[in-house]
């Protein structure tokens, strides 16, 4: 199982779906996600196709641009999704920002609400990227590896990168899940695993030194606790 994705280069755009979510990836899970969980994962994709193609379209990208960032909307139910749309989304429809990002805790554990909130955010009319937070994982998953299956079905990979103008944006999943000493209850902490560190190292190796690098993640790198 894997997710293949393209790193959007400067001056190009990827397609977006009806919810303005960038479609820069291909999910390969022949058997799909494990069944039996409350929140659906990825459906079986079958065998890998002969080719996996990522369309890119040219676009103008100025050095100076605006982007919208917000974090922790955390709606628990449809009523709170409506609050997000009314109090936040409606205020920024018509913005001149070129894209937006939700920096994690898109939901408050009820992952069935991803869809309704995505539909609301799509009204802003710009590509919208998403970072995974601790409340966006499937709490029923038996391991960290399976905790983001629902997120992947909706948004694609939990870590990736893209260019816009003279900036390079790196999205990271820094929510590490682990079992308690009894091996039963799952808890989380901030951190990056070996695979992500390898991706980060390889990604930065191709970024010019003069380019601005922006890290996007949910849990702060430094804590006063």
Model region roles, listed by residue range:
Residues 2-30:
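A short, solvent-exposed beta-strand micro-motif common in secreted/extracellular proteins
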Residues 30-31, 41-44, 113-209:
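Extended active-site neighborhood of metal-dependent phosphoesterases/phosphodiesterases
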Residues 33-114:
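N-terminal active-site segment of His-dependent metallophosphoesterases
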Residues 74, 106-107, 135-136, 175, ...:
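Catalytic metal-binding/acid-base residues of hydrolase active sites
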């Amino acid at each position: 199982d894997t997710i293949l994705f393209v790193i959007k280069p400067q001056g190009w755009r990827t397609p977006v779906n009806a919810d303005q979510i960038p479609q820069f990836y291909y999910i390969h899970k022949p058997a799909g996600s494990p069944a039996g969980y409350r929140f659906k994962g990825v459906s079986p994709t079958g065998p890998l196709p002969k080719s996996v193609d990522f369309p890119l379209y040219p676009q103008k990208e100025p050095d100076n641009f605006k982007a919208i960032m917000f974090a922790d909307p955390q709606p628990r139910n449809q009523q709170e999704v409506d609050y997000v749309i009314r109090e936040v989304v409606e205020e920024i429809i018509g913005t001149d920002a070129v894209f937006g990002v939700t920096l994690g805790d898109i939901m408050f554990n009820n992952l069935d609400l991803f869809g309704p909130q995505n539909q609301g955010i799509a009204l802003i009319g710009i590509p919208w990227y998403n970072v995974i937070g601790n409340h966006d994982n499937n709490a029923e998953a038996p391991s960290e590896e399976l905790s983001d299956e629902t997120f992947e079905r909706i948004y694609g990979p939990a870590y990736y990168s893209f260019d816009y103008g003279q900036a390079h944006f790196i999205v990271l999943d820094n929510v590490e899940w682990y079992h308690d000493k009894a091996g039963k209850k799952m808890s989380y902490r901030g951190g990056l695993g070996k695979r992500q560190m390898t991706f980060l190292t390889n990604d930065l190796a191709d970024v010019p030194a003069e380019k601005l690098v922006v890290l996007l993640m949910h849990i702060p790198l430094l804590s006063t606790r």
